[in-house]
Design a protein with these regions (language model features):
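Metal-dependent amide/peptide-bond hydrolase catalytic core
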Residues: 8-223
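A glycine-rich helix N-cap at a beta->alpha junction
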Residues: 1-9
Length: 223
């Protein structure tokens, strides 16, 4: 069973005679985490080697500075191959956003799907400037490439160190399907019937869509 989901269907004019229509066939998994540091509460005027804020700040800095290794999903590679062929360029995986700058905002989306990502987004600690809190918490938005969920969590655990732990606030699977079948053929045929320069290409989505829900029902979802 197949479905057409909520993202995709937009085009990129890469040459006068070629427009790429992006069809989502995969998307990253989601891991929203609370990073928690426990320490010793006390007065702000005292020395405190067990400061929860200090421990959390170090962990957040390590995660923010970490350079995640490239993990090129087949859908991502198919998209990159199509763009390389269309533009006559060689895309450098270390500077993909610069290589694809002429594609506009799509370049950032492609850059985000070259690897797992983890962005600290929220901080919570203390209630008064002269009181050292016993706990500090940060919110983290993590996204992992299909097939690399275990690597994502192992890396986060290592970066947190001994004094910080994580709790999962929200977790959703990564989704993928092959760019093939009768529906894909029909998409290409319909596009070319309306646009002679059209070519459908697969891509990997950095965010989350209804494809996650459909996949749990055994439905292949294209965006």
């Amino acid at each position: 069973t197949e479905a057409i989901g909520e993202v995709g269907g937009f085009s990129l004019t890469v040459r006068d005679d070629l427009r790429l229509y992006l069809v989502q066939v995969a998307e990253k998994g989601l891991a929203w985490l609370n990073l928690i540091a426990d320490g010793t509460a006390g007065h702000g005027s005292m020395r405190n080697p067990d400061n929860a804020v200090t421990a959390l700040a170090g962990a957040v800095a390590r995660i923010g500075a970490y350079d995640w290794p490239h993990r090129i999903h087949p859908a991502q590679q198919a998209f990159l191959d199509a763009v390389e062929d269309a533009l006559g360029i060689e895309i450098n995986a270390d500077s993909v956003e610069e290589s694809l700058a002429r594609l506009g905002t799509v370049a950032r989306m492609v850059g985000a799907t070259m690897s797992n990502t983890a962005n600290p987004t929220m901080l919570k600690a203390g209630y008064k400037v002269n009181v050292i809190p016993g706990q500090a918490v940060a919110g983290l938005d993590g996204r992992f490439i299909p097939g690399y969920e275990e690597e994502f969590f192992d890396t986060i655990t290592e970066l947190l160190g001994d004094k910080v732990r994580y709790e999962i606030a929200n977790r959703h699977i990564a989704v993928e399907t092959e760019f093939s079948g009768a529906l894909v053929d029909a998409m290409q045929a319909c596009l070319q019937a309306e646009d002679a320069q059209a070519k459908a290409v697969p891509f990997l989505m950095s965010g989350g869509t209804d494809a996650k829900g459909w996949s749990t029902l055994g439905v292949r979802c294209f965006g």
